[in-house]
From Swiss-Prot:
Its EC number is 3.2.1.17. Residues 236-303 are annotated as: Disordered. Belongs to the glycosyl hydrolase 25 family. Glycans are attached at N67, N170. It comes from the Eukaryota. Residues 1-24 form the signal peptide. This is Counting factor 50. The active site is at E125.
Length: 303
């Protein structure tokens, strides 16, 4: 009888864990510029509305986010225990080539700063003057991802159905990594199959479904993973006027092909300081997908 009770308790714990994971599906992301201006009360508000935060740690022009330690600390103190980082690297940006050196520098800095994080997302999108030929770009992105993995980092890819082929052509050798895709359809679900089936991916890990909106007085992008049933939509997410692009630099023009691919997709905020402020082209085909089995909910990167 005791054995049966123990089995029942174990099964119950597993079911409860699954329920907690599925219901905790709302996330936000923002740039390094936005992250340094968030007050303690805003952090608390963001943590009460989301279970996950993704913070920019590297921009092609500005490189390593020197404030990342204090920003991650503020997120932890607010209650976030699922903290991801994203890095926008570009082959033509100073200090970004080769990709292996840029990733090694990034990981070394994170280790020196004692940063605890879950997943590192490699941001792949267009910006003015950031990239070379598609085949060279593909080699660069693959080198970045594989270098990060080789250093013991949990790594995924962020992109969209429009930005991916514009940047890396038909690259499909990274589909075993989690994919976070952008498609601005105001719909926290994975029902938009056509927008994440690119680059060899067939299922997503996370979706950026609203770009450059306002939550708790902070300019953010809205994302979801899991069921998405409790995530905000445009009718309920805004709390004041937006304060600017959630990520990406204010310098540069909207270069990411403003109407390529399907409407309302592409990343609104992750460009580098040297590239476009909205390099993900507000209307470029969406999509960051990635294998659902590697959604970045593990124990974090060991660096």
């Amino acid at each position: 009888m005791n054995k049966m009770n123990n089995i029942f308790l174990i099964i119950s714990s597993i079911i409860l864990s699954i329920v907690i994971f599925v219901s905790g599906e709302c996330a936000i992301d923002f740039s390094s510029e936005i992250s340094v201006g968030i007050s303690d009360s805003q952090w608390s508000c963001l943590a009460s509305n989301n279970q996950r935060v993704i913070i920019q740690v590297w921009s092609g022009g500005g490189q390593y986010n020197s404030n990342i330690s204090s920003v991650v600390s503020a997120a932890e103190q607010a209650g976030f225990d699922n903290i991801d980082l994203y890095a926008f690297l570009c082959s033509e940006c100073d200090g970004n080539y080769p990709a292996s050196s840029a990733i090694q520098s990034l990981v070394s800095s994170l280790k020196s700063d004692g940063i605890n994080f879950n997943m590192l997302w490699i941001d792949v999108e267009q910006c003015d003057g950031c990239w070379g030929a598609e085949s060279d770009n593909a080699d660069y992105v693959q080198e970045a991802v594989e270098t990060a993995q080789g250093l013991g980092v949990l790594v995924g890819v962020y992109s969209s159905e429009g930005e991916w082929p514009q940047t890396v052509g038909n690259l499909s050798t990274l589909s075993q990594y989690p994919l976070w895709y952008a498609h601005y359809d105001d719909n926290p679900s994975f029902s938009d199959t056509a927008f994440y089936e690119f680059g060899g991916w067939t299922s997503p890990a996370m979706k950026q479904y609203i770009g450059n909106t306002n939550q708790c007085g902070v300019s953010v992008d809205l994302d979801f993973y899991g069921s998405g049933s409790g995530c905000s939509t445009s009718s309920g997410s805004a709390s004041g006027s937006a304060s600017g692009s959630a990520s990406g630099s204010a310098s540069g023009s909207n270069s990411g092909s403003s109407n390529s691919g399907s409407s309302n997709s592409g990343s609104s905020n992750s460009g580098s300081n040297s590239g476009s402020s909205n390099s993900g082209s507000g209307n470029s085909g969406s999509s960051n997908s990635g294998s659902a089995s590697g959604s970045g909910t593990g124990s974090g990167s060991s660096i």
